[in-house]
Amino acid sequence: MLPSKTYDLNNVEPDWRCMLSKADSRVPISWRNWLADAGSLTERLMQASDGNLRVSVLKQGFEVPRFSERQLLGLADRRRAMVREVVLYGNAQPWVFARSVLPLTTLTGRLRKLRQLSNQPLGELLFKDPTMCREPVQVACFDAGNRLLPPSVSSIDQASWGRRSVFRLDKKPLLVAEVFLPDFHPYHLA
């Protein structure tokens, strides 16, 4: 069941809202467990795919993040950040589109290594870091065919659910958004 109002991303970002709990009635029951999970999505997808998880980098570079991303990260309007977009494939199926925004001030010192992730899942590093703190999860419903997702995944013909969180490593922020794609069926994998 999808909410009565989904969001046309041709012109606007989705309506990101804090997920109150795993019992949040705005979210379909089949999605709640995955969207509210506080652990590593990478680890959970590895288990669900029996270790057959692959990361495909769609793009990585420096750009001005979207308005809501800048707000969450406390970035000035024209401040650039490293933006990385990937698709996580489980059992050779596209399961999750992920977009990470890392401010330049985060990519210093020992965290410079985040510039060189290649095909390594960011979640692997985040959840192994003893300084990692995660802020509350926000969730949103994405309309089919939205334009904020890259063309390789925006041709989906049904609405999808996503979540995002600000993480802090050494008190430095980074944002991770994850959108579950139609080939991912949470009710089969809960």
Language-model segment annotations:
Residues 1-83, 87-89, 93-146, 150-155, ...:
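N-terminal domain-onset segments
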